[in-house]
Structure formats: C-alpha cells, structure tokens
C-alpha cells in the first residue's frame, strides 16, 4: 500500500478541517485515548522500589505494543489500492497537527502584535510549560517560536515520517511514544526512573525527523546558508538531542536568539542560547516564524507527495 499517499490524504483533511470541536466533544481524540491508558497504567505501576525502571519499561512496551497491534489490524483490514489509501488517510488524519499547531501559535501572535501582553501570556500558556507571568514581549515571542519549532518536529514531521515508513502502525505507534514521553518522560523524582524508557525511545524515534524538520526550516528560509550554519553550529548545545535542530534552524532563519534561560513554575532552567549573538525576537518575528512554518510544511508536503508519486509508478 502507498503509505506516502495515505499521509497526503491525512494532511489534506487536517488542513481543511483540523480536529473539529464537535467531533472532539463526541468521541474525544485518539491521543487522549492513549493518554488515558498511560494514566491508568502509571497509577497502578509507578511506585517506589528497585524495579521501578523495569515497570516503566513494561508500561512503555504495553502502550506502544497495544497501539501498534490495533493499528496494524486495522491496516490489514483495509481494501487494496486507492480505496485503502483513502480510508487509511482518514484514519491517519487525527495524528496530524498541521492546522492546530499554526492556530495555537497564531493565537499568541495576534494579541502580542496588538500590544496585548496579558492576552499573549494567556495564549502562550496553552503551548508551553514555563511561567507566563514572568514573560515580557520578547519572552512570549521566544516561547512561542520555540514551541512552533519543536512541535513541528514532534507533532507533524515525525508522525508523518513514520507514517510514510509503516502506515497506520507507524503514525499511531509514534504518537503513542510521544505521548508517553510527554506524560511520564520527565526528570523528576516521580518519573526519572519510571519514565526512563519512554524518554529514551522518544529520543530514538525523533533522531531523523528532528533533523529533517531543521532542514525544512532552513531550506524554506530566504537566508538558507545562515539557517544551516546556525543549525550545524548550535543544535547539539540544546539539552535535548533532537529539539535543538529545528529550534536552531528557526533561530538562524529569523536572525533571532532562542532557548536560553527560562523560568518554569517549579524551577529555573539555565539553557545555552541558540544563535546567541542575535537579538531577542520581537512580536513581528512571530508572524515571520509562522510564515516560515507555512513554507516549510508546504515543502514537506511536496516531498511526501513526490514520494507518493514515485511509489505509485514503481
């Protein structure tokens, strides 16, 4: 089956519809179903003891395995040819977040550009974990741009990459891994041991997509050479083995500095700067970042479309 064509169908539906509120109210969302399973297993299995890390490994394998097996069973049921591609694309659609990512960041950009800092702080609190009350205008713009860059990889490029590789088991399995990481893959007393496997698996499956995302941002920039240079120089200085690639490319493309020190509700994180000699982002840079995002994601869609065409004629 042409998995790349399946992903093109999913992209098209997501761009047209997003995930409608009426549908969410009626059935929720597949990621929330996965999250509910994780929460139930975490509640029963995450307690202190010598085998805490092993229990976390078993929970990660159970969640990923359950998701992949269900998705594989559905995929094997699909009819052959283009009807199967169309149905598969519809089923893959919930795992694509092109439209919602843009809308969430645009909801920050609108009040920020209008000078409504409280409104921008409220909007950015929906997409980042840091304390919004501590953010000035450049801080809000920086937080939103970093979220846009990192989540372009985690929420869009990576699931589509694995969807192209393996179809429904690939895209659904990736979202299970990413949801595990977001829920239990934290370096806290509660999760450092229990979430160890989830965090390591997430690092592994994002190695290629994160670098592809950085490349898409760099190639979509009018200043390609600068974006590529900043990405190559600074990406590895990020605390994450993957997030630094799209964030550094974004910083170089927009000629601003990203990452750096930030305040969370429970701690201060003194992170190194990406493109540290550049100025802080301004409100207008957030609009430029959204434009870069649109061009980069259009380029990604074109690449997937070309793969689909080559797949169909091979």
UniProtKB/Swiss-Prot annotation:
GO molecular function: ABC-type vitamin B12 transporter activity; threonine-phosphate decarboxylase activity
Subcellular location: Cell membrane
Chief location bin: membrane
Residue stretches spanning the membrane: 3-23, 57-77, 78-98, 154-174, 290-310
Gene Ontology cellular-component terms listed: plasma membrane
Biochemical pathway: Cofactor biosynthesis; adenosylcobalamin biosynthesis
Keywords: Cell membrane, Cobalamin biosynthesis, Membrane, Transmembrane, Transmembrane helix
Membrane association type: Multi-pass membrane protein
UniProt cross-references to HAMAP family, sorted A to Z: CobD_CbiB
Assigned protein family: Belongs to the CobD/CbiB family.
Identification of the protein by name: Cobalamin biosynthesis protein CobD
UniProt source species: Rhodobacter capsulatus (strain ATCC BAA-309 / NBRC 16581 / SB1003)
Gene assigned in the entry: cobD
């Amino acid at each position: 089956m042409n998995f790349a064509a399946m992903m093109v169908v999913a992209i098209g539906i997501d761009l047209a519809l997003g995930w409608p509120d009426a549908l969410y109210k009626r059935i929720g969302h597949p990621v929330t179903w996965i999250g509910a399973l994780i929460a139930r297993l975490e509640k029963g299995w995450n307690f202190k003891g010598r085998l805490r890390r092993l229990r976390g490994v078993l929970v990660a394998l159970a969640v990923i395995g359950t998701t992949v097996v269900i998705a594989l069973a559905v995929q094997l049921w699909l009819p052959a040819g283009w009807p199967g591609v169309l149905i598969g694309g519809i089923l893959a659609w919930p795992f694509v977040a092109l439209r919602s990512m843009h809308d969430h960041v645009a909801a920050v950009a609108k009040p920020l550009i209008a000078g409504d800092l409280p409104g921008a702080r409220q909007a950015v609190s929906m997409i980042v974990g840091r304390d919004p009350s501590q953010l000035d205008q450049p801080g809000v713009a920086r937080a939103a741009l970093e979220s846009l860059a990192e989540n372009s990889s985690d929420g869009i490029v990576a699931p589509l990459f694995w969807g192209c590789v393996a179809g429904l088991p690939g895209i659904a399995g990736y979202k299970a891994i990413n949801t595990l990481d977001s829920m239990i893959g934290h370096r806290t007393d509660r999760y450092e041991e229990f979430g160890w496997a989830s965090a390591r698996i997430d690092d592994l499956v994002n190695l290629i997509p994160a670098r592809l995302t950085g490349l898409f941002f760099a190639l979509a920039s009018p200043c390609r050479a600068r974006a590529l240079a900043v990405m190559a120089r600074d990406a590895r200085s990020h605390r994450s083995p993957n997030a630094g690639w799209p964030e550094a490319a974004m910083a170089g493309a927009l000629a601003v500095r990203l990452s750096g020190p930030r305040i969370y509700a429970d701690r201060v994180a003194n992170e190194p700067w990406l493109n540290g000699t550049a100025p802080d982002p301004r409100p207008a840079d957030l609009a430029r970042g959204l434009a870069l995002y649109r061009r980069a994601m259009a380029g990604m869609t074109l690449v997937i479309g070309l793969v689909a065409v080559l797949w169909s004629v091979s």
